[in-house]
């Protein structure tokens, strides 16, 4: 922080608050802020033992507020001139020009704390304090010779105008007073009153001493109040000269006769008025003393000497009085010289008026008159004296003392003459002598007087001429000496300038401005004080440069502000005011002169044209239309429901918040570059400058990276092609960037791009090589007949055995990674422990080949699946126990021949081990563990396929058994629905017919059922399989099979349970089973007797829910599977196959899981019963009815069938 001034404390001050400083008289202070006229913020200067200012003082107690009237600006050490131009490098330094006069306040040998002197030599300097290099400033005291010729000419002119004026200039610092014998001050100071003023005396070290200054009685005295120094008393006539400095400091120059060790006295008055009063009093007292010194005050002497002027030696123009003639014998005792008179050497002898003796009547003799005769010639020295010649007749008028007598000559003139020059005579002798010589004496006296006057004029002219010549010689000598000094000074400065300009010293020592700024900011501003209001802290605001400010006026002329122009921002000009505040004013509000000034700076026209005014009016009209159109929307919003209004209100609030965020981001901390002005200077259109400036500020671009910007970077920021060229040229011109730099930047960018391309190409070549090697191995294995099973996806390792990076975005990176090696000894111990553990009970399930689940997530190339942390089912499908056979009661009709047992399918083929080395280095250990596990046998019957609906019922029963266990379904991709047809295969490669969802046709092996009344070839009604299938999953407690197919329909009874009462002939009503199977319910006989011709017997039909031991066994088996799922052997097997912690729904599911989605079988029961017609037929064949039925009901019931009956 730069200092405003260096001041010195005038008085002691005790701080009244924590933010104030304690002051002691003569303490030096660095003034930091002086905006407030009554309180200044200052830092106390500390000195070390050698008197050098301490530069590293970081004590906060040295910064605070001080009263402005308790300090004054300190006196400089010297005045010096700058040898070279110097430009300030930091805020604490000061710029200076060559030959500029500087006031030096401090010096540490390397840096000088200075202030510019300015044009007024009596002022305290201009501007602020600052440091300059000591080797850039002349060490010698500056010689100011600029005003010497003017003073010389003025003195010459004044001398020519007043060459005859010999009065002494008592108001200024004139020539010293001639040495004369002074009378007593008591006599000189009569009538001179004493006046006193409170002042401070300054010693040789510029220390102040309070006291009282008094002037009067032809004396000047000073009484100190701070010490016991005796009162100094000086004659007013010993003050040779006096001057006033800075309006308050009185400088007195004393003559050697003062008898003091100091030749000068300095007093500091409290105000300018008091200083002026002191000057006037000195001049008045000095004039009174000089007048009193010239008064005829006789001084008695014991031995009178010849009369002589006391100051005859001071000037050659005053002649010495003639020596007295020898005393006559008769009057030897009276022949004494006159006493010494105290006269002023600067006053000329009085001019006597020519008095005509004829005009003066002769004094009539009186008897009481005493006559005398002049014994010597006497020249009058004062106005009251009388000039007499030897032997002149005189009349003695008074004898007031023994030294001087008052006489009258024959011409009637009166005056005083020395008593020793006059001899008294008697009256008769005087009368006789005077009667004859009166006329001759009068004529001789007149001639003598005229001669004396002429002689005096000639002598005065001679003296004046000699004085002028002497002064001219003195002036020439002074001019010559001054020229020699200036020549020597010029030669010395030229010699210094001829040397190379030294480098500025390093900033090794400098006042700790950081501590000063911090301490200054911590100063609190007290409130409610009786003392003056404290200045506000303005340290955080930077002030504009005074050289760049100007007066700005608005269009009305009512407001004016002095500020510095910073640039444009969104159609407004930015101004930096003198108090540090930055404001923005619209251009159209500025006066025409300011707009013209801005146009000269920017080179663009800123006054709006007619087209722009019309466009602005059109925009205003458009905005008005938009506001009017938005009003119906507001009314529409008011008519919305409450929920819609709330949503609309939230939407508006979110828009407002977003607008505020943008405004806060736009009004954030400003960077040191005004990008708007930058683009404007580059020639970019004003409308685009704002957008480009916001882009640069958003991307944190500053001046340090401007030289490295290339067209591609500017294009990515959003600049247009033409603006890119303009900005590039402007950057090259402003920062002197040559073409080689641009080419080097482009070459670097292209080199980086080429390097990246080469690295990508190398990686791609390696990946292609690896892929080609794998394809070659697969092709070779295929030619050899080997089946190579792809390596299962690993959770923690990749295909090459390296650990995967299982970290994903959003999860913390693990601090340490586990080793990729597996301890074989630990696995062997685990294997033995598993071998000793009891083998779990074997489970019977439908045998199906193990199908590796297909990866549906991200590829292994990504290193980690997106769903790696979701639960997953085990890789091997748990075996399902065989469903227990539910025994059904024998029907009353002859039973059909039993179906032969289903053929045992061949065992599943074991995958041939690949000849290629295992992809996972731990696969061998996991295979050993899998080999120790007991294999579970599974048997799956192969359902047959009926080629046509006309096959025998026996074949149908062998080909399809609805109660038999079903094979597993094919795996379902994650992105497909569950109701797609699942077609798994057995080891033989043949398809197993599985049905899920709603089918458009009936299952293989099931006969079409005809409904209605058949008129021709009507056969007995076939049994219908009805019941509810568990499709919703909520009835899984009843078992995976849901409701068993139940047989309903007509039996062979006689009509409605009565034999022989039906018009139809046929068998009897067969026993029908209703109720819950396995719950102890007895079968109920329902239905009709056969009522048509050629009707065959109806087989036993089963109805009801099957919830016997089969469902209980399924529940127990599910619980046992859930317990064994988390055993160590199963977990190791899952980790080996890559199915650990995967979604159970993504793996192949159990065959019973989707039974709810299978269509319920309807058709023939074993026994060879033919299809039956129900209802009334109208000549249509059974096949036509079957087709109609299939067209009318293309889908099965959601519950897998419905109710089958004859009604």
From Swiss-Prot:
| One GO cellular component term | actin cortical patch
Q: Which residues are in the SH3 domain?
A: 2-76, 77-142, 367-427
Composition-biased stretches, type Basic and acidic residues, lie in 465-496, 531-540, 619-629, 641-665, 773-786
Entry keyword Glycoprotein = no
Q: Where in the cell is it found?
A: Cell membrane; Endosome membrane; Cytoplasm, Cytoskeleton, Actin patch
Listed under GO biological process in this entry are: actin cortical patch assembly; endocytosis; regulation of actin filament polymerization
Residue span of region Disordered? 143-185, 325-367, 448-553, 609-667, 736-757, 773-919, 936-979, 1175-1207
Record-linked InterPro entries: DUF1720 (IPR013182), PH_SLA1 (IPR056996), SAM/pointed_sf (IPR013761), SH3-like_dom_sf (IPR036028), SH3_domain (IPR001452), SHD1 (IPR007131), Sla1_SH3_1 (IPR035800), Sla1_SH3_3 (IPR035821)
Spell out the Acidic residues composition-biased ranges: 151-169
Q: Which is an annotated GO molecular function term of this record?
A: actin binding
**Polar residues composition bias: which ranges?**
542-551
Bias kind Pro residues: ranges: 891-908
Record's subunit section: Component of the PAN1 actin cytoskeleton-regulatory complex.
The similarity comment for this entry is: Belongs to the SLA1 family.
Q: What is this protein called?
A: Actin cytoskeleton-regulatory complex protein SLA1
Protein source organism: Mycosarcoma maydis (Corn smut fungus)
């Amino acid at each position: 922080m730069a200092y405003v001034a260096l001041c010195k404390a005038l008085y002691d001050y005790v701080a009244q608050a924590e933010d104030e400083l304690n002051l002691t008289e003569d303490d030096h202070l660095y003034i930091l802020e002086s905006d407030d006229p009554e309180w200044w913020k200052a830092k106390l200067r500390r000195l070390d033992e050698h008197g050098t200012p301490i530069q590293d003082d970081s004590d906060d107690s040295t910064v605070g507020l001080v009263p402005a009237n308790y300090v004054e600006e300190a006196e400089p050490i010297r005045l010096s001139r700058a040898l070279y131009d110097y430009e300030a490098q930091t805020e604490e330094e000061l710029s200076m020009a060559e030959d500029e006069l500087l006031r030096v306040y401090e010096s540490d040998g390397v840096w000088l704390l200075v202030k510019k002197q300015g044009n007024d030599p009596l002022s305290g300097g201009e501007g602020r304090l600052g440091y300059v290099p000591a080797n850039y400033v002349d060490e010698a005291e500056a010689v100011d010779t600029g005003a010497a010729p003017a003073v010389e000419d003025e003195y010459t002119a004044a001398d020519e105008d007043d060459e005859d004026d010999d009065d002494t200039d008592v108001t200024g610092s004139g020539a010293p007073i001639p040495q004369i014998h002074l009378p007593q001050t008591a006599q000189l100071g009569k009538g001179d009153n004493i006046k006193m003023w409170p002042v401070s005396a300054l010693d040789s070290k510029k220390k102040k001493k309070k006291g009282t200054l008094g002037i009067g009685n032809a004396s000047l005295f000073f009484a100190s109040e701070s010490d016991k120094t005796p009162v100094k008393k000086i004659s007013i006539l010993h003050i040779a000269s006096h001057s006033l400095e800075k309006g308050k400091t009185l400088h007195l120059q004393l003559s050697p006769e003062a008898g003091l060790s100091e030749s000068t006295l300095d007093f500091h008055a409290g105000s300018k008025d008091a200083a002026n009063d002191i000057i006037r009093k000195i001049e008045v007292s000095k004039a009174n003393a000089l007048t009193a010194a010239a008064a005829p005050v006789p001084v008695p002497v014991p031995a009178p000497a010849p009369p002589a002027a006391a100051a005859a030696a001071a000037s050659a123009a005053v002649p010495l009085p003639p020596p007295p003639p020898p005393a006559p014998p008769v009057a030897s005792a009276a022949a004494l010289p006159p006493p010494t008179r105290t006269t002023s050497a600067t006053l000329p002898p009085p001019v006597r008026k020519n008095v005509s003796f004829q005009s003066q009547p002769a004094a009539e003799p009186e008897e009481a008159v005493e006559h005398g005769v002049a014994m010597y010639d006497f020249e009058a020295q004062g106005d009251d004296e009388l000039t007499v010649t030897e032997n002149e007749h005189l009349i003695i008028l008074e004898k007031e003392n023994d030294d001087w007598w008052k006489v009258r000559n024959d011409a009637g003139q009166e005056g005083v003459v020395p008593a020793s020059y006059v001899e008294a005579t008697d009256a008769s002798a005087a009368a006789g002598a005077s009667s004859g010589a009166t006329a001759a004496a009068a004529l001789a006296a007149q001639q003598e007087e005229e001669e004396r006057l002429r002689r005096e004029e000639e002598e005065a002219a001679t003296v004046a001429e000699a004085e002028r010549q002497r002064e001219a010689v003195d002036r020439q000598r002074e001019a010559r000496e001054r020229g020699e000094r200036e020549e020597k000074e010029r030669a010395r400065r030229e010699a210094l300038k001829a040397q190379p300009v030294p480098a500025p010293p390093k900033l090794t020592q400098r006042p700790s401005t950081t501590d000063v700024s911090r301490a200054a900011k911590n100063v609190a501003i007290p409130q409610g004080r009786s003392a003056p209001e404290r200045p506000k802290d303005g340290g955080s605001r930077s002030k504009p440069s005074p050289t760049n400010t100007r007066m700005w006026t608005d269009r009305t002329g009512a407001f004016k502000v002095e500020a510095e122009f910073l640039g444009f921002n969104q159609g407004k000009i930015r101004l930096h005011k003198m108090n540090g505040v930055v404001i923005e004013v619209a251009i159209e509000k500025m006066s025409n002169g300011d707009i013209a000034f801005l146009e000269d700076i920017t080179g663009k026209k800123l006054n709006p044209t007619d087209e722009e005014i019309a466009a602005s009016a059109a925009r205003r009209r458009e905005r008005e239309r938009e506001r009017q159109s938005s009003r119906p929307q507001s009314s529409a919003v008011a008519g919305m429901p409450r929920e819609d209004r709330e949503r609309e209100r939230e939407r508006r609030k979110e828009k407002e918040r977003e607008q505020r965020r943008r405004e806060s981001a736009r009004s954030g901390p400003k960077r040191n570059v005004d990008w708007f002005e930058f683009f404007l200077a580059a020639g970019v259109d004003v409308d685009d400058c704002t957008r480009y400036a916001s882009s640069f500020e958003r991307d944190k671009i500053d001046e340090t990276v401007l030289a490295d910007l290339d067209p591609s970077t500017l294009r990515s920021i959003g600049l247009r092609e033409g603006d890119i060229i303009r900005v590039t040229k402007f950057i090259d011109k402003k920062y002197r960037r040559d073409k080689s730099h641009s080419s080097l930047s482009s070459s670097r960018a292209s080199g980086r791009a080429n390097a990246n391309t080469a690295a990508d190409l190398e990686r791609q070549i390696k990946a292609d090589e690896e892929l080609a090697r794998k394809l070659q191995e697969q092709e070779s294995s295929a030619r050899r007949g080997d089946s190579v099973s792809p390596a299962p996806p690993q959770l923690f390792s990749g295909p090459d055995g390296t650990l995967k990076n299982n970290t994903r975005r959003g999860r913390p990176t693990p601090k340490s990674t586990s080793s990729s090696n597996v301890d074989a000894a630990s696995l062997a111990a685990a294997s033995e422990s598993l071998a000793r553990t009891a083998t779990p009970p074997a489970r019977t399930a439908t045998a199906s080949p193990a199908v590796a689940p297909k990866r549906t997530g991200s590829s292994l190339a990504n290193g980690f699946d997106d769903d790696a942390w979701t639960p997953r089912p085990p890789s091997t499908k748990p075996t399902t126990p065989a469903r227990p056979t539910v025994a059904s009661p024998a029907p009353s009709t002859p039973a059909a021949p039993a179906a032969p047992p289903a053929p045992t399918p061949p065992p599943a083929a074991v995958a041939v081990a690949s000849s290629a080395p295992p992809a996972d280095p731990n696969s061998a250990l996991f295979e050993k563990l899998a080999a120790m596990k007991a294999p579970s046998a599974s048997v799956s019957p192969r359902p047959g396929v009926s080629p046509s609906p006309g096959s025998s019922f026996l074949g149908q029963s062998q080909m399809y058994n609805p109660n038999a266990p079903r094979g597993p379904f094919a795996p379902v991709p994650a992105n497909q629905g569950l109701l797609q047809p699942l077609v798994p295969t057995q080891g033989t490669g043949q398809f197993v017919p599985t049905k899920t969802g709603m089918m458009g046709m009936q299952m293989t092996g099931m006969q079409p059922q005809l409904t209605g009344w058949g008129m021709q070839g009507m056969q007995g009604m076939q049994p219908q399989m009805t019941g509810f299938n568990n499709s919703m999953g909520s009835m899984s407690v009843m078992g995976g099979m849901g409701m068993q197919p139940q047989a309903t329909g007509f039996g062979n009874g006689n009509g409605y349970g009565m034999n022989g009462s039906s018009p139809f002939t046929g068998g009897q009503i067969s026993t029908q089973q209703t109720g819950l199977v396995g719950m102890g319910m007895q079968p109920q006989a329902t239905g009709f007797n056969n009522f048509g011709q050629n009707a065959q017997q109806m087989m036993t039909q089963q109805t009801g829910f099957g919830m016997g031991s089969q469902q209980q066994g399924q529940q127990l088996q599910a619980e046992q599977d859930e317990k064994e799922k988390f055993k160590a052997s199963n977990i190791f097997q899952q980790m080996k196959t890559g199915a650990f912690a995967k979604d159970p729904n993504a793996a192949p599911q159990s065959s019973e899981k989707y039974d709810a989605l299978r269509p319920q079988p309807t058709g023939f029961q074993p026994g060879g019963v033919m299809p039956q017609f129900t209802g009334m037929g109208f000549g249509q064949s059974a096949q036509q009815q079957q087709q109609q039925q299939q067209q009318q009901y293309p889908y099965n019931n959601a519950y897998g069938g419905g109710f089958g009956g004859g009604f």
